[in-house]
Regions:
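A conserved acidic beta->alpha catalytic loop
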Residues: 26, 37-47, 60, 86
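Active-site nucleotide-sugar/metal-binding loop of Leloir-type enzymes
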Residues: 69-81
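Short, well-formed alpha-helical segments that are part of the catalytic scaffolds
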Residues: 10-29
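Short, structured coil segments at secondary-structure junctions
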Residues: 29, 50-52, 164
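Catalytic-site signature of metal-activated, phosphate-bearing donor transferases
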Residues: 65-66, 72, 92-273
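Short, acidic/glycine-rich phosphate-metal binding loop used to engage nucleotide
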Residues: 57-64
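Acidic helix N-cap motif at the loop->helix transition within catalytic regions
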Residues: 18-22, 42-51, 94-95
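Cell-envelope/extracellular polymer assembly enzymes that use nucleotide-activated donors
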Residues: 6-8
Length: 276
């Protein structure tokens, strides 16, 4: 049993009562947990109080910084390391053990982490595993700034990734991403994301910046009808999504639909611009 892991966990939330309790329960060994709330109207604040963790309310003014960067700039952390975690992301014992070991002796200033997705009630071992950079040293950087106009209603960094100065490592033990809110919520959420992505691409087509290799490939193809089918083949065939049965097929199909929506919305934006 590992106790007092010297990492500050930050959980940005809004109305996450269904998953927040389980998420916090699994973080017992962490030295500090801070929940940053966008004025939830459900029982989320009471759940944070029950677990005796720090509660911070965030009110977005529509400008930079958004929630994660605002927290990095305005909330004092007890520890050298910060881990950003969503309320539907659950740490495992293996992850906690590996985390405690790697941060105790490393020259890295951040770590990539793999995520296993649960989709339609099934924990997906194949397909296209999610990978993020949510763990880094405080002061080593922050989430990228992406200029936005009125088309963005997101108060938190969703598409933005941390820009860090230093070596980046890898933690092999995954975090479990378990979304309990069903397909309707999944489709609505990705509809919002595709709108954001289309507008952002049209506003600023030079995405070379400090992108990962995968992101550079994505933005070279995103203005093409081919990206959706290519991504389906990548998820379902090359990454073994077919081994997951109907859930693997649906997962890959929804990913294909997402990129179709981005391209279709790009065409709509251009049509509207031509008529102005």
């Amino acid at each position: 049993m590992i106790n007092n892991i010297p990492v500050t966990v930050v959980i940005p939330i809004k109305n996450e009562e269904k998953t927040l309790g389980k998420c916090l329960e699994l973080l017992e060994e962490f030295d500090e947990v801070i929940v940053v709330d966008s004025s939830s109207t459900d029982k989320s604040p009471e759940i944070v109080k029950h677990f005796n963790r720090t509660y911070v309310n965030f009110v977005w003014n529509g400008l930079f910084p958004k929630k994660r960067n605002w927290t990095l700039r305005n909330v004092k952390f007890k520890n050298e390391w910060v881990l950003f975690l969503d309320a539907d992301e659950f740490v495992t014992d293996k992850f906690k053990q590996e985390l405690a070991v790697v941060i105790s002796n490393t020259n890295c200033i951040g770590f990539w982490i793999n995520y296993q997705n649960e989709f339609m009630g099934k924990l997906m071992k194949h397909g296209a595993p999610m990978k993020k950079l949510p763990l880094f040293k405080v002061g080593s950087g922050e989430y990228e700034y992406i200029p936005e106009k009125s088309w963005s209603k997101l108060d938190m960094e969703i598409h933005e990734h941390p820009v860090l100065k230093g070596d980046i490592g890898q933690i092999n033990s995954p975090i479990i991403h378990r979304d309990f809110r069903g397909l309707t919520h999944y489709i609505q959420k990705h509809n919002e994301y595709s709108s954001w992505e289309a507008h952002h691409y049209q506003e600023k087509k030079d995405h070379s910046g400090e992108l990962t290799y995968q992101q550079r490939i994505k933005y070279k193809l995103i203005d093409s009808w081919a990206l959706g089918p290519l991504y389906f083949c990548y998820c379902y065939i090359f990454r073994g999504g077919f081994l997951e049965g109907k859930e693997g097929f649906m997962w890959a199909a929804y990913k294909m639909q997402y990129f179709f929506n981005v391209k279709a919305k790009l065409e709509e934006i251009r049509m509207q611009d031509d008529h102005e």
